[in-house]
From Swiss-Prot:
The modification N6-acetyllysine is found at K179, K182, K340, K398, K510, K544, K570. PROSITE patterns: AMP_BINDING. Its main location: mitochondrion. Transmembrane segments: none annotated. Belongs to the ATP-dependent AMP-binding enzyme family. Residues 1-41 form a transit peptide. This is Medium-chain acyl-CoA ligase ACSF2, mitochondrial. The gene is ACSF2. It is found in: Mitochondrion. One of its GO terms (molecular function) is ATP binding.
Length: 615
């Protein structure tokens, strides 16, 4: 047997749906294309081991395909784990004083799933979960999957117009939320676009602006026109409804859509990336394998998750990965709080910690950081946006996370496609986002020539494999723009790949600055500015300029207590970077515009700077 790199394809049948771009079977690239691209044949022996390094000097790599992918649904995975480790702690929600074993969680999920069906929801209906991290969020994530209902992850910070947009976009039939969190009055926000809810019969809502929405469920307070979540769960507790749920399981497929994750909106209007059981189960399972969770003892499987569950990293690498490996998921607070994360590590003997770079910066900067017992920590995941090398080193050394893994992915890819191995060196973790994940292909394309880029040459990163979404819900044209005929997803990220297969994200193709014909990648300059001893964080954007087209603007956040000047920063650049890369504008800031998941919205930052500079 002989196959070539690029021909190992994973065919998958995706359930047809009115919102998804038809059936998605992964297609093989022709052997002629492979030869034209300089890709050589592999022996069967090579196929059996990990194929994680580029061949022929070109930026293409394929992950290991030795182990089979998992064809179970989320519900089947929960059942397997509950049978294997029934008495192990599954979920701890510190701010709600919730503790459940896997057996208890399975029982509650079954009742909630049965309850959702009992109130008239059906397989394929969309249910929006709108709120901060909570027990109810985890319950709805798993119960919808068990019932065949598609969970719509709604940003908890959304206001009326944003909420209306996403509910209409996917045709939500049900919406679940708490009454209030901090200043966010969820019920009152809904009333702005759905005033009919106040006088509606619970479960029989008829709304002019939201014609698909019939059922509103309140998590924690009786509200006019709504059902209480406890009532829904109680309704599903009868033997009749539980038997019906069991009967319905035979009609669920791992290729059914399970979750609509709206992209973060860092570049414009959010799009509803639609993911299947197959996407989510396998991505979480493969990431756990990369983290070597199968080698850990129960005491070493205690995951602190400060990331929002509405985001793909939280729901897949958090909830689902813990479910797959029998790990304990610990929610420290409703939204990220650095102090609460440290308290959770200390109190719950946490071993793994997730976070974005911004979250880790805040954790490290806690005034009483040294007072917490973090001796049980051993690893974790940092993802969401590029992390400077100095931050990686600080996390490993100060938080005791020697097995830290830098992960890269996109919502459209379920999400993780690149990650380090725990044993990779600090330098490798500081300078790249790791190596390709199993059952995943990556290539970097020369954006001008449309061919495979040579190694160590920037180009647009493309991904193919089981992990690619079913499509953007209700937007076939945007799906076609993102996923080409050969099933490659074009990420929009500019990246390089070295001889060992390590990938480095250079920036967004839309973020690339073109100054007088010179291509400038913000990530390169951001890495450089992080070497300045007074700089805490920096973001580089392009701002409009009549003469040069664009000029460089560095938005710098200084370390606490530090002071410097524009002149000193520019002097620091001279002789170290090319003259055309020295920013024309240096602006000192105290914060950046962020999505709720902690990603920096560069398009908003660019707009702010252009206003600030009167451009």
């Amino acid at each position: 047997m002989a196959v070539y790199v690029g021909m190992l394809r994973l065919g998958r049948l995706c359930a047809g749906s009115s919102g998804v771009l038809g059936a998605r079977a992964a297609l093989s690239r022709s052997w002629q294309e492979a030869r034209l691209q300089g890709v050589r044949f592999l022996s069967s022996r090579e196929v059996d081991r990990m194929v994680s390094t580029p061949i022929g000097g070109l930026s293409y790599v394929q992950g290991c395909t030795k182990k089979h992918l998992n064809s179970k649904t989320v519900g089947q995975c929960l059942e397997t784990t509950a049978q294997r480790v029934p008495e192990r702690e599954a979920l701890v929600v510190l701010h709600e004083d919730v503790r459940l074993t896997f057996a208890q969680l399975k029982e509650e999920v079954d009742k909630a799933a049965s309850g959702l069906l009992s109130i008239g929801l059906c397989k394929g209906d969309r249910l929006g979960m709108w709120g901060p991290n909570s027990y109810a969020w985890v319950l709805m994530q798993l119960a919808t999957a068990q019932a065949g209902i598609i969970l719509v992850s709604v940003n908890p910070a959304y206001q009326a117009m944003e909420l209306e947009y996403v509910l209409k976009k996917v045709g939500c039939k049900a919406l679940v939320f708490p009454k209030q969190f901090k200043t966010q009055q969820y019920y009152n926000v809904l009333k702005q676009i759905c005033p009919e809810v106040e006088n509606a019969q619970p479960g029989a809502l008829k709304s002019q602006r939201l014609p698909d929405l019939t059922t509103v469920i309140s998590v924690d307070a009786p509200l006019p026109g709504t059902l209480l979540l406890d009532e829904v769960v109680a309704a599903g507790s009868t033997r009749q409804h539980l038997d019906q749920l069991q009967y319905n399981q035979q009609f669920l497929s791992c290729h059914d859509p399970i979750n609509i994750q709206f992209t973060s909106g860092t570049t414009g209007s959010p799009k509803g990336a639609t993911l299947s059981h197959y996407n989510i189960v396998n991505n979480s399972n493969i990431l756990g394998e990369r983290l070597k969770l199968h080698e850990k003892t129960p005491e070493q499987l205690r995951m602190i998750l400060p990331n929002p569950l509405y985001h793909c990293l939280g729901s897949v690498a958090g909830t689902m990965m813990c479910l797959m490996y029998g790990a304990t998921l610990i929610l420290a607070s409703p939204i990220f709080n650095g102090k609460k994360a440290l308290e959770a590590i200390s109190r719950e003997r946490g071993t793994f910690l997730y976070g974005t770079p911004t979250m880790f910066v805040d954790i490290l900067n806690q005034p009483d950081f040294s007072s917490y017992d973090i001796s049980t920590m051993c690893g974790g995941v940092i993802a969401g946006s590029p992390a400077p090398p100095e931050l990686i080193r600080a996390i490993i050394n100060k938080i005791n996370m020697k097995d830290l893994v830098v992960a890269y992915g996109t919502t459209e890819n379920s999400p993780v496609t690149f990650a380090h191995f725990p044993e990779d060196t600090v330098e490798q973790k500081a300078e790249s986002v790791g190596r390709i994940m199993p059952h995943t292909e990556a290539r970097i394309m020369n954006m001008e020539a449309g061919t495979l880029a040579k190694l160590n040459t920037p180009g647009e990163l493309c991904i193919r494999g089981y992990c690619v979404m079913l499509g953007y819900w209700g937007e076939p044209q945007k799906t076609e723009e993102a996923v080409d005929q050969d099933k490659w997803y074009w990420t929009g990220d500019v990246a390089t790949m070295n001889e060992q297969g390590f990938c480095k994200i250079v920036g967004r193709s839309k973020d690339m600055i073109i100054r007088g014909g010179e291509n400038i990648y913000p990530a390169e300059l951001e890495d450089f500015f992080h070497t300045h001893p007074k700089v805490q964080e920096v973001q580089v954007v392009g701002v409009k300029d009549d003469r040069m087209g664009e000029e460089i603007c560095a938005c710098i956040r200084l370390k606490d207590g530090e002071e410097t000047t524009v002149e000193e920063i520019k002097a620091f650049c001279k002789g170290k970077i090319s003259h055309f890369k020295i920013p024309k504008y240096i602006v000192f800031v105290t914060n950046y515009p962020l999505t709720i998941s902690g990603k920096i919205q560069k398009f908003k930052l660019r707009e702010q700077m252009e206003r600030h500079l009167n451009l």
